[in-house]
Amino acid sequence: MLNCKVIALTNQKGGVGKTTTAVNLGVSLVQQGKKVLLIDADAQANLTMALGYNRPDDIPITLSTVMQNIIDDKTLDVSQGIIHHREGVDLLPSNIELSGFEVRLINAMSRERVLKTYVNEVKKNYDYVLIDCMPSLGMITINALAAADSVIIPTQPHYLSAKGLELLLRSVSMVKRQINPKLRIDGILMTMVMPRTNISKEITATVKSAYGQKIKVFDTEIPHSIRAVEATAEGKSIFAYDKSGKVAAAYEQFGKEVAEIGEKQRNQNRADRIR
């Protein structure tokens, strides 16, 4: 689509609900009538498995296949490898081959922009492309940030997780300065929140006071719930697993927040083109 928005979901700390957010944000946007592609940019293939594909190493065409074809200057077929999921999202899966590919990528020409070459073509078919990054700042994550319009940072109200935000923000700033000047941070999403515990309240307040002036902290908070873990284990979104629960309600609200930001940015882009 002309106004497709590409969002990287990233945090250098694992276990913060990043993949769960990618799945449920994607399905929430589909429920709003948007066309959505999810890209699994992690060799652990958590996103692929969270959508029910439990044997990722048996999948013949994955992100590493597509990126290798770009390096080899082969004809780009953007439909290659995309899986259509029953909940309405499309998926470009990943598997362990991405680890070996990341090593080979170091010697490639324009190595930071290989994924961007693919995304620039495939995004013509979508309203949103969501990239689930691995919890590190390796070459694949840098590719994701180079290809993205914006970043969403899921983090849980835990001291070490919030502390790690500073390092992540510096990394995003470096990519913006050196590779992708259009990159912006849409906001920080608080996940696995236990509202009745003091530590959750204190850390949430600390993050908002530390970053809320220059970076948006989303109004929506994703509550802690075993149902979200169960849904991932079942290979389903929270909407398919527990549609009337509090986590589904939170992700529905979050999807609307993200869509609202996207619409504002689209309107701004249209205005800039008219000038």
Each language-model region and where it sits:
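P-loop NTP-binding core
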Residues: M1-R275
